[in-house]
Amino acid sequence: MKRYVLDANALLDYFGDRPGKLRFAALLKEAAHSEQRLFLSVINWGEVVYSIWMKRGEATARQMRIAISKLPIEIVPVSAEDAFEAARLKAIHKLPYADSFAAALASRERATLVTSDPHFERLGKQIPVLWLR
């Protein structure tokens, strides 16, 4: 079974008609019709909502919240152990805070990280990445 962890910008690409949209749409379609699993840390979910709220306003952020809930994506809560691993990855690789949670979740789930964010190049080959660029 394929397992993917979504970085916030994967969803922002999708909802924002950015270059990664078509590749991410194909991933969503595959997840809806297969055993493939898509995970999103609640931290990265909050990052998506915040980004949309700041760019398009509260009403649009609330609509996106509903739209995301209808996608074949599992929103994953964060434990203290997850936060520790995210802090470790942030300290070692100098990742932005929210990005470190996506990386920690991908590591824990032995999943491929889905992103178009160049910050994740800092991980080297530690975590497999599906680039949406």
Give the label of every model feature segment.
Residues 32, 69, 107:
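Anion (oxyanion) recognition and catalysis
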Residues 51-54, 72:
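Helix-loop "lid/cap" segments that line or gate small-molecule binding pockets
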Residues 11-12, 45, 120-121:
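A generic structural signal for short hydrophobic patches within well-formed alpha-helices
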Residues 1-3, 75, 103-133:
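Acidic, PIN/NYN-like endoribonuclease modules and their adjacent C-terminal/linker elements
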Residues 1-40, 53-66, 132-133:
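Short, well-structured N-terminal submotif of metal-dependent ribonuclease cores
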Residues 74-114:
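Active-site neighborhoods of divalent-metal-dependent phosphate/nucleic-acid chemistry enzymes
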Residues 15-16, 52, 90, 124-127:
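Short, flexible helix/strand-to-coil boundary loops that buttress conserved ligand/catalytic motifs
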